[in-house]
UniProtKB/Swiss-Prot annotation:
Family recorded in the similarity comment: Belongs to the class-II aminoacyl-tRNA synthetase family.
Catalytic activity: tRNA(Asn) + L-asparagine + ATP = L-asparaginyl-tRNA(Asn) + AMP + diphosphate + H(+)
UniProtKB keywords: Aminoacyl-tRNA synthetase, ATP-binding, Cytoplasm, Ligase, Nucleotide-binding, Protein biosynthesis
Location, primary (coarse class): cytoplasm
Top-level division of the source organism's lineage: Bacteria
Cellular component terms per the entry's GO annotation: cytoplasm
Source organism of the structure: Shouchella clausii (strain KSM-K16) (Alkalihalobacillus clausii)
Subcellular location: Cytoplasm
EC number: 6.1.1.22
Name this polypeptide is given: Asparagine--tRNA ligase
Catalytic EC class: ligase
Biological processes, Gene Ontology terms: asparaginyl-tRNA aminoacylation
Length: 430
């Protein structure tokens, strides 16, 4: 019976054949232990010299790391194994013998591993992180589909910036200027006016010269937009979504969390509702904690966000930021013209902002005024203004950074490990 490592539990005490690679091995005179991986998981294959043909045992001893093979054997239960099973090997068919695999079991530096990212992905740690990333993506689609959202695809090439910033990658689009997208938000707003509730999911690009553990040049965003949804209702959807992701990782990624040494009690504590504090309250809290380097109107940096998150020890919304700190499309608060109806969701354990969102301006004249105030060309945003001319309604949206969320839920220190091939300030290869 040909199967995968993830499915061997169905075949206890039965013979199976698995296509796999050698992740590692060790052997003595009479027994060889093969650490097998096939992409679905890892299992130990045990080859006993007295129980297999001579050529099979010789091959088990000579086969090299990352060689590929078909291995046939009987599935045994083993409480010592992380998966609960091992394979008593009876036959080995070599597909390809690898030579001089560069990532040996010894310790390697980060730059070396990043240079060999195409191979580093094969390690147990990277396998676990990618599985958690995949589960978060799958659970995202489940969450929004169950709530009546429509998936909307936004363009990667755009003629303007949703954020109105200069951190853009420029290219020529025949005879015009074009930019790699920083966000699908504006297009999602158009989608929400047609379909009610939508979400986009795709890569975004920021030409930021940042080298922190939280920043990537290319990263993936989940961006819902919702018609007839005001600020407070949007916050409720955000916290339900994040709690849903945490539960999904706990429910489906126990082996991966164990492999990464993640403290699962931290994830078990992620339950809605989340605390909410205003920017003003956050500023007061920071001053109580001895931060004298920040005044009203300043944005919070990583140390500030970490201090606020540590105070609550769970995700916390910081709401009502100064208008001057936020993009042109955010709705001013009805009771204070100097703050907007927005929120950043700050993850605990030093992982920083994972969601930014707001109620959007739905008044044509106010949006036009904001575009002019930010010196943004009205002709480039004419289509966006149109959304306020033909049946405009209150609406809200937010963006969740996938890589930061994966880092937080998996307990990974740096976001470079949370995307298959990271693009960093000093790295465009492989």
């Amino acid at each position: 019976m040909k199967t995968t490592i993830a499915q061997v539990g169905r075949y206890v005490n039965e013979q199976v054949t698995i296509g796999a690679w050698i992740a590692n091995k060790r052997s003595s005179g009479k027994i060889a232990f093969l650490q097998l991986r096939d992409g679905t998981g890892f299992i130990q294959g045990v080859v006993v010299k007295a129980e297999v043909p001579e050529d099979v045992f010789a091959l088990a001893k000579s086969i090299t790391q990352e060689s590929s093979l078909y291995v046939t054997g009987t599935v045994r239960e083993d409480e010592r194994s992380p998966s609960g099973y091992e394979l008593s090997v009876e036959q080995i068919e070599l597909i390809h013998q690898a030579t001089d695999y560069p990532i040996t079991p010894k310790q390697h530096g980060t730059e070396f591993l990043m240079d060999h990212r195409h191979l580093w992905l094969r390690s147990k740690r990277q396998h676990a992180i990618m599985k958690i990333r995949s589960q978060i993506i799958r659970s995202t689609y489940d969450f929004f589909s169950e709530r009546g959202f429509t998936k909307l695809d936004s363009p990667i090439l755009t003629g303007s910036s949703p954020e109105g910033t200069s951190e853009l990658f420029h290219t020529k689009y025949f005879d015009e200027d074009a930019y790699l997208s920083q966000s699908g938000q504006l297009y999602a707003e158009a989608g929400a006016m047609a379909l009610g509730r939508v979400f986009t999911f795709g890569p975004t690009f920021r030409a930021e010269k940042s080298k922190t553990r939280r920043h990537l040049i290319e990263f993936w965003m989940i961006e819902p937009e919702m018609a007839f949804v005001e600020h407070e209702e949007s916050l409720e959807i955000q916290e339900q979504y994040v709690a849903h992701l945490a539960k999904a990782v706990l429910d489906h990624c126990q082996l991966e969390l164990k492999q990464l040494g993640r403290d699962v009690t931290k994830l078990e504590a992620i339950k809605a509702p989340f605390p909410r504090i205003t920017y003003d309250e956050a500023l007061d809290l920071l001053k109580e904690k001895g931060f004298d380097d920040i005044s009203w109107g300043d944005d919070f940096g990583s140390p500030h966000e970490t201090a606020i998150a540590e105070h609550f020890d769970k995700p916390v919304f910081i709401t009502r930021y100064p208008r001057s700190l936020k993009p042109f499309y955010m709705q001013p608060a009805p009771d204070r013209d100097d703050v907007v109806l927005c929120a950043d969701l700050i993850a605990p354990e030093g992982y920083g902002e994972i969601i930014g969102g707001s109620e959007r301006i739905h008044d044509y004249d106010l949006l036009k005024q904001e575009l002019e105030k930010h010196n943004l060309p009205l002709d480039a945003y004419g289509w966006y203004l149109d959304l306020r001319k033909y049946g405009s309604v209150p609406h809200s949206g937010f963006g969740l950074g996938l890589e930061r969320t994966v880092a937080w839920l998996s307990g990974t220190e740096h976001v470079r490990e949370t995307i298959p091939f990271p693009r960093l300030l000093n790295r465009l290869y492989p």
